[in-house]
Amino acid sequence: MREQHLISLPERPAVIRLATPAESAALPAPHLSIPRLIGNTGESGEFVLPTANPNAESKAEMDDFNYEAITWDLTAHEARPGHELQFAAMIEGGVSVARALFAFNSANVEGWALYSEAIMKPYLPPEAQLAVLEARLQRSARAFLDPMLNLGMLKPDEAKHFLMEVVVLSEPLAKEEIDRYTFTAPGQATSYFFGYCKLQALRAKTELALGQKFRPQSYHDFIVAQGLLPPELLEKAVMEGYVKPLQSAAAHVSGD
């Protein structure tokens, strides 16, 4: 990230640790333990890796996160430049409570994490690039499986079969996904791909507006400095607070 000038990094290292049995039971998937956004006294986010799914009814192994290639993708998503960096930037940058807490929305948070996987992909080994695409396939499947289940257009067993046969998830993870869509967090899983598409479209719009003046590092620094604005407000902030000043500066230089 530093060598490719993708985004500014915190000075401290990211924290990655194994989950406790209680954490694995509460959330049996890799995740970021989010630091306090109000009254933070130096805490940072922690990338937590579960070692098992204690709630799994099947004895089948959940092997979706325990192979080497996926570690690159998980680190980009949960740690840097994904969740951990985004929350560190808000805390260290002094983002307002309104933007950091009250504006919280999954389209921003999960969209940024999935976008982070995409911007890191060109610099990863081939097997890790394939893992990035596999993870993106899962998020794109969520975008239609979740609403189809909740609208009664698809049965849980049909969705589970699709996840196992087409997306190639393990049986325990496929079941966990179905529970997520229909019980624990209906609608939330769609935010990953929706937010990702919004960020990709915003980047394309920004690059077209700036041409040779576009710089990934300053652009990404600006994005995370905005806190957790929803996509429409984030686009407005980028166009007015990032693109226009650069265009004005370029016009001033050419005018001189």
Walk through the language-model features, giving the residues of each.
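Long, His/Glu/Asp-enriched segments that create or flank divalent metal/ion-associated functional microenvironments
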Residues: 1-256
